[in-house]
């Protein structure tokens, strides 16, 4: 089953230049114009591992910083080409001090700090107080920064996450709306529209090293959120960007034969077109360089580039990482994200197709409405045909082995969240979730404890919200409320004890924040704040009055 994703000649040529430069004692030529990601004006955004590859590798290999993300977020104080040339020359001198060189040439970035709650502040009040601390505005950024400018203010998650993230932001925006911060919701939506217009897609985050991938496509849901305030005018305004995002996810579909894949698109044996996660690069992630190299080294039977691509695709999924993507369910080196057709991604793309059809209808574009409506129906049927497990739940699909994955996970509820599930299958999925994923602190992510952060025992705010909304949409209000109240109690317990909200929670009954993964637990925290406010509206003190 071929995976038709050969690198273009320009990229191969760029890699040759990089290898030649790495072997030289002097500065290499400036990377060609084809290298890096061009924006709409033709300017390039070049990631740190491309701008000064030898220095980048030396810093990461020598672990100058405990977090590999730290250096790629640092600001070069001079032209990268000059820094690179000086490094290649100076590193040959006796007594060369790498740390001192970095200190002279880069300004380090700090973490996003949030203040403890004021005495007596309840959970909702504290979250409202956090929004200003998490808000950033970089309409212009210093030259050569890895940060990508955005025209309007935005809210970051917090901690080591100093930039805006795509799918995080939808759940953050839910909280902003609940706090009455409607202008900030519009600002963030406009920023994402700007990213689509500038780069052709919404990157993982607004960093140059994130441009080679996206994240779960929630832009249409952001437009829905804005439409609650201004009606169909929002759909008409953002129709061009909705269509551009759709084109990004469907690029490569033309000419595919059955059982082939290209970029994000997979054509199944029956001719159905579905999607997978993907990344345009097959190198270690810059922000997790050593970790990715170590992972690839544990799979000597696989080409390293294949492992790197699957790690990057796992990062695009937002579930980085999870037994969901692992062939053996335990070892990260067995990751095969690009071989899997994920149920959540395809449910979200179904919603995107439906929203484009709605926007076209509002714009009196009949052919457009009918075309996207037909695409949505074809996708819905393909999901029902292939992404359903006979045990009674929606499941991911292994397109290479032509069978559904034998593991339920929280993504099984996305077809309910997006409204594509039949009533009968929604009910069976709800029963399976109640039997297998319900924990003392809310909804489990998976049923496996692999040591990865998107596995047992962690519960994540966005997945709680998807579950609650999906179950409510199909009349399973009691189960939705049970999940929502359990998670709220978990958040409240951590807040009462530690005075903060965190990225993820241990929902096994330990009443603490979550663990696992590649970095320490982060607090702030954008999507936990947003979902908590929405759950308080539904199930908190005084809800429904």
Swiss-Prot record:
It comes from the Bacteria. GO terms for cellular component: periplasmic space. Its EC number is 3.2.1.28. It holds the Pfam family Trehalase. Keywords: Glycosidase, Hydrolase, Periplasm, Signal. The keyword Hydrolase applies. It catalyses: alpha,alpha-trehalose + H2O = alpha-D-glucose + beta-D-glucose. Provides the cells with the ability to utilize trehalose at high osmolarity by splitting it into glucose molecules that can subsequently be taken up by the phosphotransferase-mediated uptake system. The active site is at residues 320, 503. Its main location: periplasm. It comes from Pseudomonas aeruginosa (strain ATCC 15692 / DSM 22644 / CIP 104116 / JCM 14847 / LMG 12228 / 1C / PRS 101 / PAO1). The gene is treA. The keyword Mitochondrion does not apply. Belongs to the glycosyl hydrolase 37 family. GO terms for biological process: cellular catabolic process; cellular hyperosmotic response; trehalose catabolic process. This is Periplasmic trehalase.
């Amino acid at each position: 089953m071929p995976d038709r994703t050969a690198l273009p000649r320009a990229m191969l040529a760029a890699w040759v230049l990089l290898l030649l430069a790495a072997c030289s004692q002097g500065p290499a030529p400036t990377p060609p114009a084809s290298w890096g990601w061009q924006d709409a004006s033709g300017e390039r955004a070049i990631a740190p591992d491309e701008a000064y590859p030898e220095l980048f590798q030396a810093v990461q290999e020598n672990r100058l910083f405990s977090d590999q993300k730290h250096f790629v977020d640092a600001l070069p104080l001079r032209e990268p080409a000059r820094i690179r040339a000086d490094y290649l020359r100076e590193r040959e001198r006796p007594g060369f001090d790498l740390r001192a060189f970095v200190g002279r040439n880069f300004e380090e970035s700090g973490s996003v700090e949030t203040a403890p709650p004021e005495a007596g502040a309840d959970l909702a009040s504290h979250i409202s107080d956090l929004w200003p601390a998490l808000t950033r505005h970089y309409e212009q950024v210093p030259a050569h920064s890895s940060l990508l400018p955005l025209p309007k203010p935005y809210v970051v998650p917090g901690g080591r996450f100093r930039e805006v993230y795509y799918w995080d932001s939808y759940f953050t925006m839910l909280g902003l709306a609940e706090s009455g911060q409607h202008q900030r919701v519009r600002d963030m939506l406009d920023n994402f529209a700007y990213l689509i217009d500038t780069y052709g897609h919404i990157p993982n985050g607004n960093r140059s090293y994130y441009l080679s991938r996206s994240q779960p496509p929630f832009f249409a849901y952001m437009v829905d959120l804005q439409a609650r305030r201004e009606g169909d005018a929002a759909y008409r305004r953002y129709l061009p960007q909705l269509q551009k995002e759709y084109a990004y996810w469907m690029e490569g579909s033309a000419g595919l034969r059955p059982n082939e894949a290209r970029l994000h698109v997979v054509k199944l044996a029956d001719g159905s077109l579905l999607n997978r996660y993907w990344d345009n690069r097959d190198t270690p992630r810059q922000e997790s360089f050593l970790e990715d190299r170590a992972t690839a080294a544990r799979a000597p039977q696989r080409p390293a580039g294949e492992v790197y691509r699957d790690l990057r695709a796992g990062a695009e999924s937002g579930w980085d990482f999870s037994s969901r993507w692992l062939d053996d369910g335990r070892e990260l080196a067995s990751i095969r994200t690009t071989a899997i057709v994920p149920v959540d991604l395809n449910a979200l793309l179904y919603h995107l197709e439906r929203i484009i059809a709605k926007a076209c209808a509002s714009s009196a574009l009949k052919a457009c409405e009918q075309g996207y409506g037909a695409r949505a129906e074809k996708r819905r049927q393909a999901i029902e045909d292939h992404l359903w497990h006979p045990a009674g739940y929606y499941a991911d699909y292994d397109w290479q082995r032509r069978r559904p994955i034998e593991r339920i996970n929280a993504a099984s509820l996305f077809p309910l969240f997006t409204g594509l599930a039949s009533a009968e299958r929604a009910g069976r999925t709800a029963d399976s979730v109640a039997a297998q994923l319900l924990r003392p602190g809310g909804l489990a992510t998976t049923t496996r404890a692999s040591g990865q952060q998107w596995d047992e025992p962690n519960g994540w705010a966005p997945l709680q919200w998807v579950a609650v909304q999906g179950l409510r949409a199909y009349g399973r209000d009691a189960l939705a409320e049970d999940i929502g109240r359990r998670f709220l109690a978990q958040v409240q317990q951590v807040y009462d004890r530690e005075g903060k909200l965190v990225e993820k929670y241990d929902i096994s009954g330990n009443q603490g924040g979550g663990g696992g993964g590649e970095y320490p637990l982060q607090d702030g925290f954008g999507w936990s704040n947003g979902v908590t406010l929405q759950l308080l509206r539904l199930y908190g003190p005084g809800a429904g009055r």
